[in-house]
Amino acid sequence: MVIGTPVTTPLSKIVRTPSRVPGSRRTTPSKIREEKILVTIRVRPLSPKEQAAYDLIAWDFPDEQTIVSKNLNHERHTGPYSFDYVFDPTCSTSKVYEQGARDVALSALNGINATIFAYGQTSSGKTFTMRGITESAVNDIYGRIKLTTERDFVLKFSALEIYNETVVDLLNRESVSLRLLDDPEKGVIVEKQVEEIVKDEEHLKTLIGTVEAHRQVGETALNDKSSRSHQIIRLTIESSIRENSGCVKSFLATLNLVDLAGSERASQTSADGTRLKEGSHINRSLLTVTNVIRKLSCSGGKRSGHIPYRDSKLTRILQASLGGNSRTAIICTLSPALSHLEQSRNTLCFATSAKEVTTTAQVNMVVAEKQLLKHLQKEVSRLEAELRSPDPAASPCLRSLLIEKERKIQKMEEEMNELKRQRDLAQSQLELERRSKKELKGSDHHGPSRQVVKCLSFTPEDEEVSGASLSTNLGRKSLLERQAAIRRSTNSTNPSMLVHEIRKLEMRQRQLGDEANHALQLLHKEFASHRIGSQGATETIAKLFSEIKELQKISCIPEQIEIKDKASLKEEIARLRSQESNIASLEQKLENVQRSIDELVMHLPSCHESADSRTAPSKKKRVLPFNLSNTSNIPNIIRSPCSPMSPSSCNIVEGEIENRAPPECNNVGSAGDSFCSQLSTPVKSKDDNCTPGSRQSNSVNMKKMQTMFKKAAEDNIRSIKAYVTELKERVAKLQYQKQLLVCQVLELEANEAASDEADISDQSPLSWHLVFEDQRQQIIMLWHLCHVSLVHRTQFYMLFKGDPSDQIYLEVELRRLTWLDEHLAGLGNASPALLGDDAAGYVSSSIKALKQEREYLAKRVSSKLNAEEREMLYVKWDIPPDGKQRRRLQLVNKLWSDPLNMQNVRDSAEVVAKLVGFCETGEHVSKEMFQLNFVSPSDKKTWIGWNLISNLLHL
């Protein structure tokens, strides 16, 4: 045994946790130790004064756990009181200690806090009992220390009293009132309290004697030496274990020996003046103790409500002992005299409440960090070994439980899938109902069906972009941009419905040819039937008419569009592919028509000159192609078609087709005849008798008529030219829609062979690795060009390492960035090198967001990294020590700055992940967070970085 100076271990390393106690026969439980307060009752003999007054004994003791009133006053019987132990007047103090306090006192040697205090009315024997308990505890503690040779113990002694709510240090009587402070590690502590290191057993007994001599004592009518203050003796025990005998460094615990002052009545003690003031303070503090015990007993020791610890300094100091980290024993002392029956009952009520209070005692270990880590590793290894080799008797039971759990999980997954299917079905039905109501209000039945519109589901912004791209590069990039949207609804599309939509688009294409045919018929009649214009213009019109007829023959398809439920998609695809040459021929023919119209426009000046050279008599009979009063209706007869995706335009076109009849041409002709007859009447009636002046007037009128006709013809030809141009665009758009549907059909067939393709892809890991590296390099470069958030780059780079399942995410990310780069290039903002300081629009906002993000990361350098880590990073990234703030900014500005340097990319990802805590959370980040979303953007507030850039996808 060695008793010396205390070990200077910081209190921050005190670990209060259950642990196996080396060198002890008893092992603490594997969880927090919860136990009731040990409550015992000790009844003293009658005092000489009580015997002289012939006072009677009012209590009986049926056994060692029960006390019952004799009811000598013939009051209402209260019944027996049961406790852990009940000691009658014949029991000695040593027996009280052995059965009611010894186990609690010795637990302090094993690192568990312990408290023993006496409670009772004045002159009931509290101080007498606590003196014997203290002496026996000191003897037992030193006896156990002598037997425990593998540990070194250090004891510290301190004592205080609470006199009139004033805390006084009993080891330093010259000290004034001491303050109580709250310490986050120790709890409530007494400021400037003296703590003596105990040298040996005799030294400890000397200190105890000194403390008792310094305590406040006074005389009352009931007791010559009545304690006028609450005394608390605290013994701190730190037991250090040798390095080779255990896993923990040392145990640290406190033993509190509390001698409370007794409750008293002024009528019995005959107190006045100072004694009366002392008694009032004593009663007030004991009342607070009673309230705390009652509150704790009602909640089972758990602090579910407010516990009034701060109402008294006594309860504040003993807060941990009354319901916290401590083992507690309460010895309630009683006077057996009948004259003190009321106070004895109050004491028994207090004891009854106290035995319901639960404390949570724990082992307080002072552990070195390395030893604690080693101990925890051993504990983990032990638990893993137990898991690997479980109890054979429990294995079948566990196996059956696992099977049952798996069965339940599988059943729940099936139910979830069924619910999802029902949800999707309900949503589709709701969408169908909504679209059907819109169609009833005026939509065209020849337009795309509800299901196909839902499958394509393009936003108006997407259609504008697609319209612009169709005019330059129709089939390639737009198709790639739409395939992602088509895949989302491929599985839910009926094959027969797809074939039906293809046929309807072809019928629309055929109707466009009919419109062109009708327009050229009007123009042909204008030039051929009425012999207006030169011979070249007439031949040009005839050529146009023959080419349109040929176009109709090429694009002719059967009128049957009713498809059976089980239509062959493969046959339809083969038929469409065979028509690809016809589509190309159709476009070539339209180009020829365009050139012919241009030639016709070039003929107009020559026609005008030839008309001027002719004489007026030869032009007596002229029929204008259109009534001049109806010139404003020409755009209604020859109308430029609208977009095929517009329901309103479809209604206009189909209305013209349905309402157009053969008499329409006759109406035009009759209008022209009536107009010409009105003009030619004077010329025809008096041809021979005309004077030269009248002939000259007629010649002027004919020139005016020719000029008016020329203007009308020019307007008609320009209308046809614009119409043919628009017709080309509509044919292209129809062809594009057919390609979309064909892609959707091919996607259906591709899904059937998805499993085979997966097997093939698994068989070639080397090729996939090369593709992965190439795609990732492209994505990194596009990140740099599009000013993508650094956090998004880091998360994407660290999540996708080349697993075959990452292919879809890389493809989606690459397409999204490609689209964004093309969109910015279309605005003239392809890269920051071209922007300089004059960035505008979305590029400028993205650059601003990226700058704000770098400033945010620079602030986190000091908070997330210690000085050593920061210095290592500065050296690694070659940052000169010009200043702390500048170095942080230089470090952050170098992150993700070189997309061609993969080492820079890897190091940047590691630094950003450490700064944002991406690598510290330990949680699984879902890869689905990077999937491409085609729905409309929400109104939620976006964060800096990728969210701002991702909003560009919905332009």
Curated annotation (Swiss-Prot):
Record domain Kinesin motor: where: 36-357
GO CC term (a single one): nucleus
Listed InterPro entries: Kinesin-like_fam, Kinesin_motor_CS, Kinesin_motor_dom, Kinesin_motor_dom_sf, NACK_C, P-loop_NTPase
Subcellular location: Cytoplasm; Nucleus; Cytoplasm, Cytoskeleton, Phragmoplast
One family name in Pfam for this protein: Kinesin
GO molecular function, one term: microtubule motor activity
Induction behaviour: During the M phase of the cell cycle (at protein level).
Positions bound to ATP: G120, Q121, T122, S123, S124, G125, K126, T127
Task of the protein: Probable plus end-directed motor protein that may function in the NACK-PQR (NPK1-NQK1/MEK1-NRK1) MAP kinase signaling pathway, which is essential for somatic cell cytokinesis, especially for the cell-plate formation and its expansion. May regulate the activity and the localization of NPK1, probably by association through the non-catalytic region of the kinase.
Protein name: Kinesin-like protein NACK2
Organism from which the protein derives: Nicotiana tabacum (Common tobacco)
Gene: NACK2
